[in-house]
Amino acid sequence: METLPASWVLTLLCLGSHLLQAVISTTVIPSCIPGESEDNCTALVQMEDDPRVAQVQITKCSSDMDGYCLHGQCIYLVDMREKFCRCEVGYTGLRCEHFFLTVHQPLSKEYVALTVILIFLFLIITAGCIYYFCRWYKNRKSKKSREEYERVTSGDPVLPQV
């Protein structure tokens, strides 16, 4: 099996991330190519005016931009002259200002009771349907066999009667 060159792999990974971005409508934050320092590296990003993926230089933002990202790290795309925020886990938004809170609440007693009742009713209705289908099928089968017997016995007798 032939292996793909590293540039093809990176291009395919980048295109996959942009396809994912289009599907879930999120902002793609450029990340460094594996093996490079995150302070000064190159990354593949899609330009707004150009549908192709381009390689850009990334550096940390200057010290006067320390407070730009509320919950994340500020990065500067040198070639595009734009700044982006690399958000911490759980934060989203252009400046990492939104906390994505996932709350797991225990189920209420009413919800559990309603679920149990609905499942119980579903099982009773299903059992009733199966029972009536079996009775209908049995009656139909016995009716057919009775008709066969009537057809056989209703004909003229084979032996003469004495």
Curated annotation (Swiss-Prot):
GO terms for cellular component: extracellular space; plasma membrane. Residues 1-22 form the signal peptide. Disulfide bonds join 61-74, 69-85, 87-96. Residues 53-112 are extracellular. Keywords: Angiogenesis, Cell membrane, Developmental protein, Differentiation, Disulfide bond, EGF-like domain, Glycoprotein, Growth factor, Membrane, Mitogen, Secreted, Signal, Transmembrane, Transmembrane helix. GO terms for biological process: anatomical structure morphogenesis; angiogenesis; animal organ morphogenesis; cell-cell signaling; cytokine-mediated signaling pathway; epidermal growth factor receptor signaling pathway; ERBB2-EGFR signaling pathway; ERBB2-ERBB4 signaling pathway. InterPro entries: EGF-like_dom (IPR000742). The chain crosses the membrane at residues 113-133. Residues 57-97 form the EGF-like domain. Residues 134-162 are cytoplasmic. Glycans are attached at residue 40. One of its GO terms (molecular function) is transmembrane receptor protein tyrosine kinase activator activity. Ligand of the EGF receptor/EGFR and ERBB4. Stimulates EGFR and ERBB4 tyrosine phosphorylation. Contributes to inflammation, wound healing, tissue repair, and oocyte maturation by regulating angiogenesis and vascular remodeling and by stimulating cell proliferation. PANTHER family: PROEPIREGULIN, TRANSFORMING GROWTH FACTOR ALPHA. Interacts with EGFR and ERBB4. This is Proepiregulin. It comes from Mus musculus (Mouse). The gene is Ereg.
